[in-house]
Swiss-Prot record:
Protein name: Glutaredoxin-1
GO molecular function, one term: glutathione disulfide oxidoreductase activity
Compartment annotation: Cytoplasm
Occurrences of domain Glutaredoxin (ranges): 3-101
Keyword terms, alphabetized: Cytoplasm, Disulfide bond, Electron transport, Redox-active center, Transport
Domain of life of the native organism: Eukaryota
PROSITE patterns: GLUTAREDOXIN_1 (PS00195), GLUTAREDOXIN_2 (PS51354)
Primary location recorded for the protein, binned into one broad class: cytoplasm
Length: 101
């Protein structure tokens, strides 16, 4: 059930952030990504507050339990610090998956 929930949120041409509302790193990731001009439906923020089973799933599948979990297309690129490190590459990556206007 957790696997199908997570997989239902991922698409090749979309960026998906799994976040918790009280997490400052999650808020920073959202701010960073909202600087880009995404096509409608190509940026989704999924609040998993209170869903520890999803974090357990991420531990098994990505090696990390922390949030945010950032997916570009169907690939997990990590958390906020990983997103920051890739900031210069993001425009090209987002264009490659067809997520930008």
């Amino acid at each position: 059930m957790v696997d199908s929930f997570v997989q239902s949120k991922l698409r090749d041409n979309k960026v998906t952030l799994f976040v918790k509302g009280s997490c400052p790193y999650c808020k920073n990731a959202i701010v960073l990504l909202k600087e880009f001009n995404f096509l409608p439906g190509c940026l989704e923020v999924v609040d998993i507050t209170g869903m520890d089973d999803i974090q357990d799933y991420f531990q098994k599948t990505t090696g990390q339990r922390t949030v945010p979990r950032v997916f570009i297309g169907t690939k997990c690129i990590g958390g906020f610090s990983d997103l920051q490190k890739m900031e210069q590459q993001l425009p090209m990556m987002l264009r490659q998956i067809g997520a930008l206007v």
